[in-house]
């Protein structure tokens, strides 16, 4: 919950400062792993690979910033773990100007493959966040996706206690000392300026009651002004 509320505030401030920016929702995956040791190494490799990829010239030249969250899900058929990143990417409008600036899905796949030093084509999804959604701001939807819990207990709990303990042990080892939420670029600067604490290490004692009131009163509604070609925050 806390990450979602903080992210809403950061995105709202970005839009106020740079109303012409555009947004992408990126999902990056690699092959599944089967135990805690493999999971821990894979998550470390992904964090390093992501940093490398965001420095590639074609990506970096239009990059304003990003918000990244790592999620782990479990395949109940083979008991493997799927680790993937959800990334809300903020780019300059020039990103969509021409082929010299625009990064298509095939290129995202190749960039991620190169950054991760993989010998296979990974599954990468990239979605342009549309200016307006009939029922809900697409930006809010993307924030909700990146703000999900890294692992849901309903994903790994079964009727088999031994299996549950094994999964819990794997996840504890796999997630040990891993930063699952991070900001970059302008979003990181704004997160710091707003004095938002670390969602992984900050004050969690007062989260439920204090943040619930905040959540009720702060849901980002980013509307698109078609004449000015920019976003504005609807009060």
From Swiss-Prot:
Pfam families: Rep_1. DNA binds at residue 149. Keywords: DNA replication, Plasmid. GO terms for biological process: DNA replication. One of its GO terms (molecular function) is DNA binding. Belongs to the Gram-positive plasmids replication protein type 1 family. Produces a single-strand nick in a specific site of the plasmid, and this nick results in single-strand replication by rolling circle mechanism. This is Replication protein. The lineage of its organism: Bacteria, Bacillati, Bacillota, Bacilli, Bacillales.
